[in-house]
């Protein structure tokens, strides 16, 4: 069995299992179900899948997205750093890619795989579990993954850039010299020797990073670090309105304005 066959079978098994699990939801969404409201009145409702919490690999699995690309939009993997918006992925678009690839493949798993991958769609199943769920767009249902996308993703790269610029030993020394503070973890041996870093450790690093680099990086570098940290913290608001979303956009725009600093210094 090839790797492609194995991955396809795993994905197909997952989607077939989810169909069985969500069959009651599918039936209720299509036919409706009577439920008594808080005032004791009977109402017919049509429940649907509106939210799916998963880390990035699981997001790709459930949404039939090619690994390395965005499960929310159609931006190419080599252009994910772009600030320009791409067309959003939708369930209808993904299903059309799968059906078109199936038609062209003529029962060849390899040909089907290649046709889907060319469009940044995963090729494990012909019929995703969400394809017949009423009112559901799986790409909209996916929630942000703060741990893997921000702390274990963006912030991990940010720390690496800072270590590359000022040196691991220098950054460790600055971290060890920080005074005690309420709510701050003290890394008495620095951070470069840490292995299998947890999300909690990343969060504690984020609290102290800016203080450790603000007088050694160039102003553009400090601004870039601050912009990404602002974005990470703003993204964790429990609720958002148009004002707080504008704060997020401002932080992201600021980073894109000064991000070339890291390229210029050879990170």
Where are these regions (language model features)?
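Charged (Asp/Glu and Lys/Arg) segments that form or flank catalytic channels of large polymer-
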Residues: 2-18, 22-211
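Conserved, non-catalytic sequence blocks in retroelement Pol enzymes and Pol-derived host proteins
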Residues: 9-11, 196-199, 215-219, 241, ...
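Generic structural signal for hydrophobic core residues of well-folded globular domains
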Residues: 25, 212-216, 228, 232-235
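Active-site palm subdomain of RNA-directed nucleic acid polymerases
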Residues: 34, 217-223
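Alpha-helical bundle/repeat cores within regulatory domains of eukaryotic proteins
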Residues: 222-267
């Amino acid at each position: 069995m090839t790797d492609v066959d194995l991955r396809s079978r795993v994905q197909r098994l997952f989607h077939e299992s989810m169909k069985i699990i969500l069959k009651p939801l599918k039936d209720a969404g299509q036919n409706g179900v009577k439920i008594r409201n808080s005032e004791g009145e009977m109402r017919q409702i049509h429940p649907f899948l509106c939210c799916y919490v998963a880390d990035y690999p699981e997001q790709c699995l459930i949404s039939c997205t090619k690994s390395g690309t965005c499960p929310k939009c159609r931006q190419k993997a080599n252009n994910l750093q772009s600030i320009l918006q791409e067309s959003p992925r939708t369930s209808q678009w993904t299903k059309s890619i799968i059906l078109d690839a199936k038609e062209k493949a003529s029962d060849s798993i390899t040909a089907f795989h290649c046709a889907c991958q060319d469009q940044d769609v995963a090729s494990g199943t012909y019929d995703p579990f969400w394809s017949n769920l009423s009112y559901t767009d799986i790409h909209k249902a996916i929630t942000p993954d703060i741990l893997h996308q921000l702390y274990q993703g963006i912030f991990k790269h940010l720390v690496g850039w800072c270590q590359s610029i000022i040196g691991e030993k220098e950054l460790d020394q600055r971290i060890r010299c920080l005074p005690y503070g309420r709510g701050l973890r003290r890394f008495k041996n620095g951070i470069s020797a840490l292995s299998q870093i947890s999300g909690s450790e990343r969060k504690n690093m984020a609290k102290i990073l800016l203080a450790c680099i603000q007088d050694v990086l160039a102003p553009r570098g400090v601004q870039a670090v601050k912009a990404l940290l602002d974005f990470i913290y703003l993204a964790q608001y429990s609720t958002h309105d148009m004002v707080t979303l504008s704060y997020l956009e401002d932080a992201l725009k600021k980073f894109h304005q000064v991000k070339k600093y890291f390229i210029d210094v050879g990170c």
